[in-house]
Amino acid sequence: ESEQKQYIKLNAPIILEKGNEVEFKFGINDGYYEFSPVFRPISSTAQSVKYSVMTDGKIPFDGADNLTAQVWFVDDGKPGKLSTGDETAPTQRQSDEDMESFAYDKTGINGDFYRLKFNTGIHTVKIKCQDEPFKITALLLKRVKETEKYSDVEKNYNGTEKYNGAPIIVEGESPVLRNDYSLTAKADNSDIKVTPNDSKHSVINYIGGENWAKPYQEIVWETQVPKDGLY
């Protein structure tokens, strides 16, 4: 879906302990908005933070009093190597950056992120810590619009050249972020098509599998694009 993000920033970061709350006041245009605190967990072992939300002094929907924001993780170094020559997955640690995690239905029944409805004007959103403390710096609102048809989007590609260079391969086992600690890189040497591959040793060469099967689990990769064009 196309999007328009709006960050409502605090004058200074605030640490919310359990039961503490902070209120954001802002002007906004009419529409539906996905929302997320911009946060950092205080505990280095936290895998999520729990909070509730109120809009204009009211609970906006069932479940708004029990929301979860997922913590983002990065690899802490490169894969290790045993004395046998087999590789082990790198350990993970929390990202050093402020985190965003749009509110969602933990049951997975609702396939979209939760949304708040605002009319044009001034509104308030109150976020309350429900468990372990976290630092909050802003409220992120992302306006959701109707998704464009690909045929309409493609019309804007007229005259744009297709990329005809060497294939760009992004290895699955090397993401820059994931929002679930269980999404670790793994080894599978049963298929020679998987890269890298070693017939004698176990090497880290993929990510996901059975661990990547829950709604809203996310993995982010990064790659260098050599030139403008269609890929």
Q: Which stretches of residues belong to each language-model region?
A:
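Extracytoplasmic
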Residues: 1-231
